Amino acid sequence: MFAVIKTGGKQYRVAANDVLTIEKLEASAGDSIEFTEVLVIGEGADAAIGAPFVAGASVKAEVVDQTRGKKVIAFKKRRRQNSKRSRGHRQHHTVVRITDIVAAK
């Protein structure tokens, strides 16, 4: 069974025991979280498609870790002006493991 969930402005296709990196959630390692914005749930031709979400469906997950992404460098240089600026950014991420997919009753 699989599901498509929406979190952090992105959509993810998940199945049981999947480990995925998503945008930061306010939770610590070991906490249980539940995603209620389920767009599609099912298996094969028996998939239920929501409009926009499947009523009563949810995906349960466990927070594995809070991490940070790779550094992205923003570099600006103004030619012939002896002027430049370098700035770095690291995005915060949450690593979760999908524990259960609950279909609508």
Curated annotation (Swiss-Prot):
Any Gene Ontology biological process: translation
Keyword Ribosomal protein set for record: yes
InterPro entries: bL21-like (IPR028909), bL21-like_sf (IPR036164), Ribosomal_bL21 (IPR001787)
One of the record's GO cellular component terms: cytoplasm
Keywords assigned by UniProt, alphabetized: Ribonucleoprotein, Ribosomal protein, RNA-binding, rRNA-binding
SUPFAM superfamilies, per database record: L21p-like
GO molecular function, one term: structural constituent of ribosome
Pfam family, one: Ribosomal_L21p
Quaternary structure annotation from Swiss-Prot or TrEMBL: Part of the 50S ribosomal subunit. Contacts protein L20.
Described purpose of this protein according to its UniProt entry: This protein binds to 23S rRNA in the presence of protein L20.
PANTHER family assigned: 50S RIBOSOMAL PROTEIN L21, LARGE RIBOSOMAL SUBUNIT PROTEIN BL21M
UniProt record similarity statement: Belongs to the bacterial ribosomal protein bL21 family.
Protein's recorded name: Large ribosomal subunit protein bL21
Native source organism of the sequence: Rhizobium etli (strain ATCC 51251 / DSM 11541 / JCM 21823 / NBRC 15573 / CFN 42)
